[in-house]
């Protein structure tokens, strides 16, 4: 639906892609072996109730892990990197640094998601090669002889409507589909 693809929605957990990049670039994520420590408090999703390495926190879409990461990055660095990455239209305030992708006025369209992933894939984002390689690894969902599928899900309720995302790319030989 091309009309719907032009409408902005909350990015929800698809923002974990950019959040991971920013965490790596600022040094708040040391490397792909970094562990998000569970605080012992019961979570909305039982799989989040343990220490998680970066890839698991990303793939299990651990909201508490990524909210903590955003707080550690801080408002100034988050705002600066969002401007550099050009990830949709994020509306970030100091008090919402750990929630702006889940609730509020931040939006991204399907076309903007594709543009962001294409710039990532083509190494046109202002991130280091190291960050690119780590994010590429954690995005990988499935690899077969004939293809590689990479992506991220997201889900948010906005204006009393559910919005689900799957953003990613499929590599088949020399072709890439977003």
Predicted regions and their residues:
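Active-site-proximal alpha-helical segments within enzyme catalytic domains
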Residues: 17, 57, 104-123, 164-178
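Short, well-structured active-site flanking segments
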Residues: 24-40, 127-132
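Short, Gly/Ser/Thr-enriched beta-strand-loop segments that form substrate-interacting elements
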Residues: 141-177
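Mid-domain, small-residue-enriched loop/turn segments at the edges of structured enzyme/sensor domains
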Residues: 46, 53-54, 66-118, 122
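Acidic helix-start/capping segments at beta-turn-to-alpha-helix junctions
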Residues: 34-50, 56-59, 73-74, 99, ...
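Beta-lactamase-like hydrolase cores
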Residues: 1-8
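A conserved catalytic-loop motif detector
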Residues: 103-151
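Active-site SXXK
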Residues: 8-32, 57, 113
């Amino acid at each position: 639906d091309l009309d719907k693809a032009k409408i902005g929605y909350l990015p929800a957990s698809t923002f974990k892609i950019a959040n991971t990049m920013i965490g790596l670039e600022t040094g708040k994520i040391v490397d792909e072996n970094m562990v998000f420590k569970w605080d012992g408090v019961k979570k909305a999703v039982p799989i989040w109730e343990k220490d998680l390495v970066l890839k698991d926190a990303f793939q299990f879409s651990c909201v508490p892990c990524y909210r903590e990461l955003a707080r550690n990055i801080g408002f100034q660095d988050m705002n600066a990197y969002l401007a550099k990455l050009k990830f949709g239209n994020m509306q970030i305030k100091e008090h919402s640094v750990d929630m702006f992708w889940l609730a509020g006025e931040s939006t991204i369209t399907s076309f903007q998601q594709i543009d962001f992933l294409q710039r990532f894939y083509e190494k046109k984002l202002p991130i280091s090669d190291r960050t690119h390689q780590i994010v590429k690894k954690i995005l990988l969902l499935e690899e077969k002889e004939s293809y590689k599928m990479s992506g991220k899900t997201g889900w948010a309720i906005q204006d009393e409507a559910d919005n689900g995302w799957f953003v990613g790319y499929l590599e088949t030989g020399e072709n890439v589909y977003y």
